[in-house]
């Protein structure tokens, strides 16, 4: 009976995501992914056929995971507790490299963000979260980034509460 390739494929994808988290798009090579996955480069190509395909799969994984984690955090509590949870998730993503990978992939056009905007309020929420992610990933002092985060959410609440 042939061996199930699913775990190997998943391991390679996880290694690709980790490679992007550590080095961004600049550090993404098939050799680096293979080393991190503990396989030979040929096996990476066997499962994904090209660097581009693997990169697109990793970009989709990062975008989906990032979005789900931020939505979970925002929905974890009402009011400011949900915003605080979202802030902590943004900090976590800045620390684990997810923000760096997401910024790098978005800048390269590998993550399509146009479909997610359902209206002004949704677009404004995404802009707040994404802007703060960029600030954290680029080294803006934590207190300054948090002040901006709080001010932007308060402004959005004020604007959307007006008749």
Predicted features along the sequence, with ranges:
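N-terminal intrinsically disordered/low-complexity leader segments
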Residues: 1-7, 161-163
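Hydrophobic/aromatic-rich alpha-helical bundle segments in the mid-to-C-terminal region
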Residues: 113-163
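Short, basic, alpha-helical segments at the C-terminal edge of helix-turn-helix-like DNA-binding modules
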Residues: 60-66
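Helix-turn-helix
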Residues: 11, 15-57
